[in-house]
Amino acid sequence: MSEIDVEIVAVEREIWSGKATFVFTRTTSGEIGILPHHIPLVAQLVDDAAVKIEREGSDDLWWAIDGGFLSITDTKVSILAESAQARADIDEAKAKTDSGSEDPRVAAQGRARLRALGQTV
């Protein structure tokens, strides 16, 4: 199966990079699924985005993304975020608490983490 290079970069450093067969996330224009050889595109991610990365022969990866942009070329997907948190590092109780915050930014971060955990918000 064909693969595409994927990188998740936060303000301070590269968070993750590797190969994927499919990437799924939400932009301000709607949901997007990306396969290798996708048309070039730049899009703004929603504030409470979760990113799913499917890899051949490996478990899917989920990331909670705090705002940012998505850049797609024929061979690469770049996710440029203010911050990103892997599913394995998410504290579910804190994410639930944060999702109910009166601060819109904190609430968006909480929702993104819950989505990365596979919960419907």
Curated annotation (Swiss-Prot):
Native species: Mycobacteroides abscessus (strain ATCC 19977 / DSM 44196 / CCUG 20993 / CIP 104536 / JCM 13569 / NCTC 13031 / TMC 1543 / L948)
Domain of life (superkingdom): Bacteria
GO cellular component: plasma membrane; proton-transporting ATP synthase complex
Family to which this protein belongs: Belongs to the ATPase epsilon chain family.
Assembly, per entry: F-type ATPases have 2 components, CF(1) - the catalytic core - and CF(0) - the membrane proton channel. CF(1) has five subunits: alpha(3), beta(3), gamma(1), delta(1), epsilon(1). CF(0) has three main subunits: a, b and c.
Protein name, UniProt field: ATP synthase epsilon chain
Keywords noted in UniProt: ATP synthesis, Cell membrane, CF(1), Hydrogen ion transport, Ion transport, Membrane, Transport
Gene3D superfamilies: F0F1 ATP synthase delta/epsilon subunit, N-terminal
UniProt xrefs under InterPro entries: ATP_synth_F1_dsu/esu, ATP_synth_F1_dsu/esu_N, ATPsynth_dsu/esu_N
Function per UniProt: Produces ATP from ADP in the presence of a proton gradient across the membrane.
Compartmental location: Cell membrane
A GO MF label: ATP binding
Mode of membrane association: Peripheral membrane protein
Predominant location category: membrane
